[in-house]
Amino acid sequence: MNILVSSLRVVVASMGLCVVGYTGVILGVAQAVTPATADGSLVADASGQVVGSRLVAQGFSDPRYVWPRPSAVNYDAAAAGGSNLSPANPEIATRAKAIIAAYGVDAPIPADLVTASGAGLDPHISLAGALFQVPRVAKARGMDEDSVRGLITRLAFAPGGPLTQDRIVNVLELNLALDAGA
């Protein structure tokens, strides 16, 4: 019986140390070193109201905004995941055709604008995907296309640094910059 009680104490102490102690230390270090990312990379609008995270996509359908990649989980972070559909599945083609129709163009569309990412929550689109949307956004906002194009180019970055050729744009940050009139 003593061995059982001793073993139980060791298990409870180990769980407390690993679950509470380790987590507390890691959270404390993260808060001290990078508080913004430790809190979820939250993004605020001009009034200071938190409107989202730099790391999680949001759905935008208003023509005044740049639209993100489609999401297989309707931009629900709790349900993150892909559609698990085969590329040969007819539902993929049907979904892509509906998205293309929403853009209202016959021109070739960048692939990332009609295909969901693996988790369905990718907050970035390609520079080409953002630039493709310039005419619609500029018209809806009554802005000059060159102004919108310049803002997109300014916010585009190479995720792998100088070794990465393709540049991407964070959709939420771009839309907030558009709202701010940057």
Segments (PLM) and residue ranges:
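Extracytoplasmic/periplasmic C-terminal soluble domains
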Residues: 139-182
